[in-house]
Amino acid sequence: MEIIRGAPALSTFRVQKLMEACVNAALPVRQIYAEYVHLADLSELLETNEREQLEKILTYGPAIEAHTPQGSLLFVTPRPGTISPWSSKATDIAHNCGLGKVKRLERGVAYYVESDTLTVEQQQTLKGLLHDRMVEVVLDDFAKADVLFKRTEPAPFKSVNVLAEGRRALEVANVEMGLALAEDEIDYLVENFVRLNRNPNDIELMMFAQANSEHCRHKIFNADWTIDGEAQPKSLFKMIKNTFETTPDHVLSAYKDNAAVMEGSVAGRFFPDPNGVYSYHTEPMHVLMKVETHNHPTAISPYPGAATGSGGEIRDEGATGRGSKPKAGLTGFSVSNLKIPGFVQPWEGSYGKPDRIVSALDIMTEGPLGGAAFNNEFGRPALLGYFRTYEQEVSSHNGVEVRGYHKPIMLAGGLGNIREEHVQKGEITVGAKLIVLGGPAMNIGLGGGAASSMASGQSSEDLDFASVQRENPEMERRCQEVIDRCWQLGDKNPIQFIHDVGAGGLSNAFPELVNDGGRGGIFNLRNVPSDEPGMSPLEIWCNESQERYVLSVAAEDLPLFTAICERERAPFAVVGEATQEQHLTLADSHFDNNPIDLPLEVLLGKAPKMSRNVVSAKAVSPALEQSNIDVKEAVKRILSLPTVADKTFLITIGDRTVTGLVNRDQMVGPWQVPVADCAVTAASFDTYAGEAMSMGERTPLALLDFGASARMAVAESIMNIAGADIGSFKRIKLSANWMSAAGHPGEDAGLYEAVKAVGEELCPELSLTIPVGKDSMSMKTAWQQDGANKTVTAPMSLVISAFGVVQDIRNTVTPELRSDKGETSLLLVDLGAGKNRLGGSCLAQVYGELGDIAPDLDDAALLRGFFETMQKLVAKKSVIAYHDRSDGGLFTTLVEMAFAGNTGLSIDLSALQGTDVERLFNEELGGVLQVSRADAELIAAQFAQAGVPCHMIGTLANDQRVTIKDGAREVFSETRVALRTLWSETTYRMQALRDNPACALEEFKLKQDETDLGLTVNLSFDPSEDVAAPYILKGAAPKMAILREQGVNSHVEMAAAFDRAGFESLDVHMSDILSGRISLEEFQGLVACGGFSYGDVLGAGEGWAKSILFNERARDEFSRFFERDSSFALGVCNGCQMLSNLKEIIPGSEHWPRFVRNRSERFEARFSLVEVQQSPSLFFQGMAGSRMPIAVSHGEGHAEFASAQALALAEASGTIALRFVNGNGEIATQYPQNPNGSPNGLTGICTTDGRVTLMMPHPERVFRTVANSWHPDNWGEDSPWMRMFRNARVNLG
């Protein structure tokens, strides 16, 4: 093992935060210094030149001055027996640079602590601050790190002696192995193995437990029910299926695959043909949808828990039918009270929590980062979400008790597209090769399916450790590229059948694959790729290593599939063959035995059906006491409640523009305020048809009325999607995610009531279908504290996600109030019809109460009338702005619209019934519309005709105040800025805790700046003019190399932009160049695309660059290309970072900076304002002086120069092409207008001759006007950024 020191691991503010944590923990620590230390496991000693090369590869990131460390060493490394995602990607880079002697690279952080002598307890506390015990360990000596590379002999399987010891042997195994088997399942297994006359092996029992866990089998949803002594006619699942039986319209696949599929629109899918040439293929683009939960792992270890939750859901989408394409994601979190240090709220009590789970604050600090990082790196925009905090002692169905989300909800979902011929899975032919695609087996995530089926607190902590997984999104991206190449072959797609590997690992995935395909299988255990040779058969077969798929490929198609995988560098292995007989055999060549030898029917057969005999309960809770509520104080509290408050800290960490197909993200208007009701995507680059998704959940209402909570969730999802141009209820499909504490008094009967309310009643009445969903039935946390038994039980929680096909994405209405549209009026559509019920509201929550009666959808006809009327108005563009009424009531709806439009309001409540508090804060269904004053009465009449109450409630103010009156009486008045400050303080506090606090403060102050102009546009050219048109007509299109490396994810939209400009875009993978399949001699232009090459592990773009510089063939190819006078190149984002590290082979680039970690130390996804500078860049000719917004998505975009002198030279060279500016056109120096902290706002630069241009922002994602988060009304189909690509075509003549 070689040990190689790296750069300092913590910036100044990170060290400060760590020191503060030490002070808060009363640790006598004086100083901490941290640096990366790299460990290399070698097959033989390196030569001097090889060692130097390895040291260069391991030199990356910002230039921070190292110093000689002092103090005690605490060395944090990944847990032995695991391989970190960093390790696998860094090792790939070393191999691609020709260092074959490096078996594996690993990285740790060496902390040097100067302190007084620490007690054993203090040492443990300090270690707790330095590492995540779920995925890391702390060593006191570098030499001890060799345990990371220790290889142990494989362990054999173990048998459980049922034949001799009977049922008792299985009962013991059930507890020891954490199998979560029910009594009748133990009986079933004993009976079957006695019949087979043999003992079960541990691997067979674990496989059975996973395949039959509540998590996988949904036993409660398939159970027979008796409630209050009366047998119920249907199971829960049958009631859900009733929605499909009633309205099967437009559903192509339901209840049988990894995701549901509905009919989409016809458009031109843009992808490369087998020769690599990108083009449009006009065909139906059907829409798949899926929403998953990953609650248990997120409670244990939030970052990997949420990351692998997102990853698993993305795999479900990719593994739908015979392979498909994930497109856009959504996310959701429900947690207990945050109790932000220094910002604890009056309603946040301190009830405690068990040690084995983390706090709500930890979950919301780390979990969203994990989920966002996975989506970012995979390349899926995250466009929608919800966030609720709830933890309260209330009187509900089971008397007085604490209800809340100690076991959190972590929701991950999304939509994708699938070809018509691939919607149904194919036939698995006898003799077909059964393949695992993706990463290696690792000893992690064991028993996740069974573990998440238990209430938190029933399994031992060691088993909780085992059920945490690791994420490697860059690997999943490679696998998805393989799936893409396969579906792009149409009827020649080699994939017959595909499933993702999730809970239970291969032990669940392979049996499911062959069983669904009507086959059996013979498998060879030792063919499973594994990084840990010491694993037992159970560990190899049942571990939940991520980023894996299982699939069947006909033997004759194996060479084609192999070639695709090798080009994409996606690992795969043939593990078995499909058999006619439905039997499962797993052979182990190492021990020459069969750890599994079972008929499939024993594993997946008629395990006993569950029966639930339950009693219903009625909630009795006093009415909300209104007399002590002051409107001004109520406003302050409600705007500080995380459920209502600004969610920026959850949004800007997630890429929202990748694909170039995003039409509507969360951020609205020129001030980019996160208040959008739904997300909208374009079907492709050549159409205005698209897809929309929204969410609805009103979980606290279930503490009063289960049915109301369910109806309100469905209704809220419809109210949210109503601003998109969908047309009919039948074009909307719902995913239902049900969370409940099964067995808790009253909850089972309540769950039945809720499912019945939507499955049997509401959805059929509205022609809505629920073709997909998920359940999580163990939403309770139990523990002992100071000798007392404590529990926190979640409310029955239904989260609805609505997916719709959009007719015209240009018609989407947002909450942005417009003060430039003449005289306008605000209308309140009140589906609550004046009932003003306050039970379960945010108002009740912030005063520590529950209230007595929940709001409800009393008549489905109200929702039908609203939606159908709204859709007609949206299609005719009669609505200027729209926002639904939900959490926080009418007051919140109005002020959020005011924030988005940067305007004041003048509101009159006199048309509404009830007290001030009821009118402002009730959360009945409803919405506010801004319409032209001339149309207002006509529109109000249309709603009234549809049976929906509608009231005129005011207009925009001439000043920046929100004034609310009841006739002449003033009810409330405050400045918009003061309200925005209250609303945004929660996000500021969370950002300051998690990111660079200086950046968080700058953003908070910007939100309070009344003079901020937001995004402004000033163009020096006409964007509607196609300057390339005369050249396109001349003849053959010039060839453009659309260059990607493993992990790049922005190549398709880049190809589309150059295609529109008249180029022939060709897909070129680095493996094509390294293998000699393709030469850059063939191309006039090259573009290095954005993404996460090698997952950015050795510095963003640096690993990619080094694999060129240290590979002779690649270096020659690129050197010759850049030396050619006729060639040109563009590097965007990751491509910019990569090219900036190739300075030594690019003429005229000596003055370029490197691009390193953002000042905020956070991935920044922003819609930022830039100005084009006067420069020789051929891409920006005729554009100088233009100011316009552009997509920014990067974690390492800070331009770092070697010295102040180097920066001055770059400025003097006249090659700076692009700068961040503010709305006045001044250079942006403050965050987030300068999102990465680059000096002088620098974000684009070129060579001295202008042939090679680098830029961090993404023009290819916004070349269509509809792909811009905000744009002036007068822009046509092409945004101004299209000019860049056309300039490149003009340059070639």
Curated annotation (Swiss-Prot):
One of its GO terms (molecular function) is ATP binding. It catalyses: N(2)-formyl-N(1)-(5-phospho-beta-D-ribosyl)glycinamide + L-glutamine + ATP + H2O = 2-formamido-N(1)-(5-O-phospho-beta-D-ribosyl)acetamidine + L-glutamate + ADP + phosphate + H(+). CDD domains: GATase1_FGAR_AT, PurL_repeat1, PurL_repeat2. Phosphoribosylformylglycinamidine synthase involved in the purines biosynthetic pathway. Catalyzes the ATP-dependent conversion of formylglycinamide ribonucleotide (FGAR) and glutamine to yield formylglycinamidine ribonucleotide (FGAM) and glutamate. It comes from Shewanella sp. (strain MR-4). In the N-terminal section; belongs to the FGAMS family. Keywords: ATP-binding, Cytoplasm, Glutamine amidotransferase, Ligase, Magnesium, Metal-binding, Nucleotide-binding, Purine biosynthesis. Its EC number is 6.3.5.3. Its main location: cytoplasm. Pfam families: AIRS_C, FGAR-AT_linker, FGAR-AT_N, FGAR-AT_PurM_N-like, GATase_5. GO terms for biological process: 'de novo' IMP biosynthetic process. The active site is at C1133 (nucleophile), H1258, E1260. Monomer. It is found in: Cytoplasm. One of its GO terms (cellular component) is cytoplasm. Pathway: Purine metabolism; IMP biosynthesis via de novo pathway; 5-amino-1-(5-phospho-D-ribosyl)imidazole from N(2)-formyl-N(1)-(5-phospho-D-ribosyl)glycinamide: step 1/2. This is Phosphoribosylformylglycinamidine synthase.
